[in-house]
């Protein structure tokens, strides 16, 4: 059995060894919940990696958005180059859920664009969980949504090994039954082709091709093939071909499901007719009968997920199977930035049910559609074996449930101490701030400014520009790729000051920032709560001259607590440095690390976004262009079908640009 092998150019220092030892002891002692309360820049990810190595169990790392999930995945892949570090996030490039607006009698059909590469990464994650134990899956909150039954998925896998006697036609039938399609012209994920005694399969979980060579009815060779060059990568003794989709329904189960759906329809129709809702009764009858016809004929229909309760054989109200059910019983959960992620877990179910309730009431869906849902918070926690909450500012619930198992990590390996905090009056604050900014610019350092409103951020940005400051404004309308590029430009010195509202808190690794200015710090609320203030102040905690200025005329409870906590940590850090003779050292970190790595991932995952293609066409790797052209051509044809000719023309122009780039014009 392969074990985790942590590889890092440094060893645990400061209070990392103590934190690692305490967490390992707590988990091995059978404790269910523990918290790593780690200050910004103390190497929390490295400590967690060391714990994972020592515990040696399959681990789910949960982040609250795709950006942080990708950063964590990149870091953990560097720490564990020889282990399976997987990425599991929502595979939608675009998603408009099905909805009904009664006031205007408007029905909005579900529309979605699935990202093929993310789908492959999701399949890769579940495959790794079936085949090995040295697995870390970094996921977003989408992992609590239904994912098909693990037992059925595993049961449907097709085992192949050298020397196995099997008729080639049987394998072709099996492949078709697990959603692979035959295409003898063009290979790809979820496809297979036959050339005489050679069968080639494009697995759903990777971009290599599996070639199976037959000698009569016996498997003679199994090889991995490069999909572009056709060269043999390596030979295999055996391989499992997992289904092309996570939702696998055996034929016998499908028959029973159709009967159950028909019975529910009969009951629901009668119920609606009894209450005088004749339009709704006719609507549900017509829509469900059409779906049943499709299910019986082809085993699939649009919105099939709404029948997942029947297809999986679950009882009403039972939780759906999710990614968590693919883990073994002794799995470990790590929740990053838990003060944000834990409330997300609580909120997903309620938002989903509110939309479904309207669809059910107006005859668009059967009541069982409500069971196609994310896990409720209590269902999620029931499935958790053991958990580590990770945050610089854990929520009250995490601290309470962890009891006395709160492990503090305050010392930075670099010896850098928490920022010095000063509170200044609002009168003359802009001129005061301008002077501070100019001092930082002279030292080639960066500044973050956080305001309470979008209007103030815009006005402040304009004022600073008028005074010759190179400044950018980060607002909510900027997409994740542009956001990462702006942060990248800040680190590289393309500009010196970044102004924002609520976009400067968790997960920003910006060692060049020496000053954080918080405007209206005394305006109590979510953006100026104790945890938000500590997180924002922490953005300057990676710089040896880190400072935070709070502009306020009154001292709020949140300000007092945030300042006291920061001063407490500073005291511990200063004492440690003095005791060990440590001189704080600046963090030397290439700007191409986590942020740039994610930027590259993002471009690949979102390359079918026209704006992204246009902005980055010169930077696209040549090997990715053919695949991108295929995707854009499919979008162009779809746009033409919908009579969206302007959109189709834009896509055509982008395709021409890409083809010109490919031939070197």
From Swiss-Prot:
It is found in: Cytoplasm. ATP binds at residues 38-45. Residues 25-412 form the Helicase ATP-binding domain. GO terms for biological process: nucleotide-excision repair; SOS response. InterPro entries: Helicase/UvrB_N, Helicase_ATP-bd, Helicase_C-like, P-loop_NTPase, UVR_dom, UVR_dom_sf, UvrB, UvrB_inter. Keywords: ATP-binding, Cytoplasm, DNA damage, DNA excision, DNA repair, Excision nuclease, Nucleotide-binding, SOS response. It holds the Pfam family UvrB. Coiled coil: none annotated. Its main location: cytoplasm. A motif (Beta-hairpin) lies at residues 91-114. One of its GO terms (cellular component) is excinuclease repair complex. Residues 626-661 form the UVR domain. Residues 429-583 form the Helicase C-terminal domain. Transmembrane segments: none annotated. HAMAP family: UvrB. Belongs to the UvrB family. The beta-hairpin motif is involved in DNA binding. The UvrABC repair system catalyzes the recognition and processing of DNA lesions. A damage recognition complex composed of 2 UvrA and 2 UvrB subunits scans DNA for abnormalities. Upon binding of the UvrA(2)B(2) complex to a putative damaged site, the DNA wraps around one UvrB monomer. DNA wrap is dependent on ATP binding by UvrB and probably causes local melting of the DNA helix, facilitating insertion of UvrB beta-hairpin between the DNA strands. Then UvrB probes one DNA strand for the presence of a lesion. Forms a heterotetramer with UvrA during the search for lesions. Interacts with UvrC in an incision complex. This is UvrABC system protein B. It comes from Nostoc sp. (strain PCC 7120 / SAG 25.82 / UTEX 2576). The gene is uvrB.
